């Protein structure tokens, strides 16, 4: 990560790993052509809760609980019927890490009260990606108001340092509106090391079914 402030530099120096994605489902309830996780091509599949818990526990032991941020991802993570249990386990093994659920937001209005109570008690952030024709900043802001939640937009690394205990926080990110163009080289002749070092997401790792990937793409 590029640190723009002294506070950010100190924050990241305290952590062994800047960012880890944990995949809760392979599939999604959208069919985006630009999906970098290839969810539209995936079969309906959820990573078993026991596997996720084992992975999170092992990561906590190896990283000595020094992970700056964890993103609970998919596919669409809210499709996983054990999402509440996964949230509790994530917070159990990473009590001080910034944890967020990355969702397209479609299922949020139908989520049970138990889900929202867990969000509040664990301090896990609900981060909604923006999609044309699916949601908007104003819609998300109004939804956050209905839930009595804090609303954030265009969050920075500084927000990772915040603790969100006993309140609901809803954020937005650019989603498909903010993604860069990722060309596929079918010939396989590109310089892998160069591409990895210059990828804007090169610090974004992925934990999935017993494997720790240095790149989120290859986990899919």
Residue ranges of predicted features:
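Accessory C-terminal segments flanking Radical SAM cores
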Residues: 180-220
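Short, charged/polar "capping" segments at the starts of alpha-helices
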Residues: 108-111, 134-139
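Glycine-enriched alpha-helix->loop->beta-strand junction motifs that scaffold or abut catalytic
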Residues: 120-125, 147-149
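Sequence contexts marking disulfide-bonded cysteines in secreted/extracellular proteins
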Residues: 2-4, 162, 175-177, 198-200, ...
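Non-cysteine beta-strand/loop elements that form the S-adenosyl-L-methionine
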Residues: 123-134, 153-156
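Basic phosphate/pyrophosphate-binding loop/patch that engages nucleotide-derived ligands
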Residues: 138-157, 174
């Amino acid at each position: 990560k590029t640190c723009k402030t002294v506070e950010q530099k100190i924050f990241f120096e305290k952590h062994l790993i800047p960012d880890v994605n944990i995949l809760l489902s392979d599939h999604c309830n959208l069919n985006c052509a630009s999906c970098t996780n290839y969810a539209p091509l995936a079969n309906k599949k959820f990573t078993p809760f026991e596997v996720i818990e084992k992975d999170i526990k092992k990561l906590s032991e190896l990283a000595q609980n020094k992970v700056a941020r964890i993103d609970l991802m998919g596919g669409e993570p809210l499709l996983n019927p054990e999402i509440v249990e996964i949230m509790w386990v994530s917070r159990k093994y990473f009590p001080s890490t910034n944890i967020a659920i990355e969702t397209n937001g479609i299922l949020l209005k139908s989520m049970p009260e138990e889900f929202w109570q867990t969000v509040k008690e664990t301090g896990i952030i609900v981060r909604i990606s923006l999609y044309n024709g699916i949601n908007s900043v104003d819609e998300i802001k109004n939804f956050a108001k209905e839930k009595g939640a804090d609303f954030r937009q265009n969050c920075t690394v500084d927000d990772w340092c915040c603790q969100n205990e006993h309140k609901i926080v809803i954020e937005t990110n650019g989603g498909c509106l903010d993604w860069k163009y990722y060309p596929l080289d079918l010939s396989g002749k590109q310089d892998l090391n160069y591409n990895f070092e210059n990828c804007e997401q090169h610090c974004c790792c992925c934990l999935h079914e017993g494997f720790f990937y240095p790149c989120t793409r290859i986990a899919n």
